[in-house]
């Protein structure tokens, strides 16, 4: 076993796994989605988390209908739990449709999604 500690996960009303994190020192509520290839942050929170864009916008496919505009960020500081600290790039994408669905089912809003890219690189 490595020296990293475990991070407490919460189960939402919709049975999604949630965790609290800090991104560039700011608190974030993140949904854990093993089916999401990339970790992402709600584009409206770019300034709040002090995220810097990298590259040009692109069309991203997801669970919603059609494609959505997205842009990558430079790596930023992320902290999960008390001791895990690392760097992570995110996809900035509009998550209003995700939050609307969660809200309609009585669940809390999320700031972003931890995807398979993060999970694979931080086994």
Summary of predicted features, one role per range:
Residues 1-123:
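Pepsin/retropepsin-fold aspartyl endopeptidases
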